[in-house]
Amino acid sequence: MRHQKSGRKFNRTDAHRGAMFSNMIASLFKYQLIKTTLPKAKELRRFAEPLITLAKVDSVANRRLAFARLRNKEAVGILFSNLGPRYITRPGGYIRLLKCGFRHGDNAPMAYVEMLERPIIAEEVT
């Protein structure tokens, strides 16, 4: 029986699941907004928010802990230089999930995963 077992498996091995979420977190930190399925978005929040909390205190030990999870130097740099200082006063809840309909093909529920307080870049209209 699977009582008290938290986390979704997504029909993947443990290594595949870990690599998938590491890549998704790196993309989220780089682009500030990604689109994925709703169950993956909900699970992604469980992995990403503790990393942002870790980045509030910039130390070598915290950078190594973040790198152990992400395995991406660029994402760790963004995490500690941009995101940690941005959320220094926020006690949690750094990520917003926005439902955005269903995927054509398999009708899977989709969602946007967005970093709160992200800078909005105005596009020039010509």
UniProtKB/Swiss-Prot annotation:
Q: By its UniProt entry, which InterPro entries does this protein fall under?
A: Ribosomal_bL17 (IPR000456), Ribosomal_bL17_CS (IPR047859), Ribosomal_bL17_sf (IPR036373)
What UniProt keywords apply to this chain's record, in alphabetical order? Ribonucleoprotein, Ribosomal protein
Kindly name one Pfam family recorded for this protein: Ribosomal_L17
- For this chain, the annotated S-S bridges are none
Gene3D superfamilies listed in its UniProt record: Ribosomal protein L17 (3.90.1030.10)
Q: Name one GO biological process term.
A: translation
Q: Which GO terms describe its molecular function?
A: structural constituent of ribosome
* Keyword Ribosomal protein found: yes
Query: Quick one: a GO cellular component term?
Result: cytosolic large ribosomal subunit
HAMAP family according to UniProt: Ribosomal_bL17 (MF_01368)
What assembly does the database describe for this protein?
A: Part of the 50S ribosomal subunit. Contacts protein L32.
The family annotation for this protein states: Belongs to the bacterial ribosomal protein bL17 family.
Matches recorded under PANTHER family:
LARGE RIBOSOMAL SUBUNIT PROTEIN BL17M, RIBOSOMAL PROTEIN L17
Q: What is this protein called?
A: Large ribosomal subunit protein bL17
- Organism (species): Xylella fastidiosa (strain Temecula1 / ATCC 700964)
Traced from the root, the source organism's taxonomic lineage reads: Bacteria, Pseudomonadati, Pseudomonadota, Gammaproteobacteria, Lysobacterales
